[in-house]
Amino acid sequence: MLSVVSNGKDVLLICGTMNQTLQMLQIGAELEKLGHRAWFTPYYTTGIYRKLEDLGLLSFTSILGRQKAQAQATLDSRGVKQDFGGRARAYDLVVLCTDLLIPDNLPPNVPWVLVQEGLTEPVTFFSNLVVKLHRFGVPLWAANTSAVGLSGRWTRFCVASQGYADFFAERGCDRSRIVVTGIPNYDNAQQLRQLEFPLRDYVLVLTSDLREVFQIDRRMKFLREVRDRNPGEKIVFKLHPNEKRERAEREIRKLFPDAPVFQTEPAEPMIGHAKKLETQTSTLVFLGLALGIPVTSYLDLDELRRLLPLQNGGRSAANIAQVCAELL
């Protein structure tokens, strides 16, 4: 039963990518239902990182590039309470979308709740090296999302599934502070069937922003494999929001001259009516697995099934809000 407090507290929710922003909005709405005050900010930097951001040297990142402006526009359109940089008031709790780069103005004496966004990058020799050298000052963000959670600076870490709880514990996170809540946007795949989208019975190709974050992407090889695996099928493309569209679409047109190409539109309705997903490293592969449709991925599908986010009918945001409330 919903328990509403009479002395609500101030909670700062730090957004990031569009997915993270939508997750935070859902969590904030649940906190408001509990009687607390949810304040939002797009991701922001401090210190030397602020100077680098001002110079445009961090625009390649997903949380500080184009998606930061999209996050701000989304917050504006929702009419939620905002406090850019969390500077206007003292907060009783902070909800983080990542701990790879933590603003240095966050209050150290209040609880921090970290929320898993989705799929993490594969663990590599380099990412393990970064983690080992972190104690000597090497920043965790250099390991990308494979190092999520390893700052250890959070009070609770809300994760997608029991499989992920085990995964993060194996990576070195404190298991006693990890809570399996499910994660918003990936906890109710069946609902996608009800969303409106004009096309039906197609193969949906979900590309990733590997090149934009300086990873290897043999894009033309991937596109040829998609073509060869799906002869005669209707193909629809959904580009990652962080991708350079002109380049990506030019490559697609070489093999798929008439295929629809989307980028800014939400992927969920497209997934709900697809017959198959072709992915690179997209977290959205989880939705295809939850729906039971065929999927391909650069990642190990058996491992993805082990990590599959809880399907709890969309209760994850409320679960996370309850974790926050217990700390207030």
Residues of each region from the PLM?
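Nucleotide-activated donor-dependent transferases that construct or modify glycoconjugates
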Residues: V4-M18, V205
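Active-site and donor-binding regions of nucleotide-sugar-utilizing enzymes
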Residues: L12-L34, W39-N188, V285
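Conserved catalytic-core segment of nucleotide-activated headgroup transferases in glycan assembly
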Residues: L22-M24, E30, N185-E251
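Catalytic donor nucleotide-activated moiety binding site of glycosyltransferases and closely related
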Residues: Y44, L55-S62, N230-T264
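Short, charged, surface-exposed secondary-structure boundary motifs
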Residues: Y49-K51, P122-V130, N188-R193, M270-H273, ...
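Active-site regions of enzymes building and remodeling cell-envelope glycoconjugates
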Residues: L55-S62, P108-V115, R175, I252-F262, ...
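A donor-sugar binding/catalytic signature common to diverse glycosyltransferases
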Residues: L96, Q263-P309
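Leloir-type glycosyltransferase catalytic cores
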Residues: W154, R306-L328
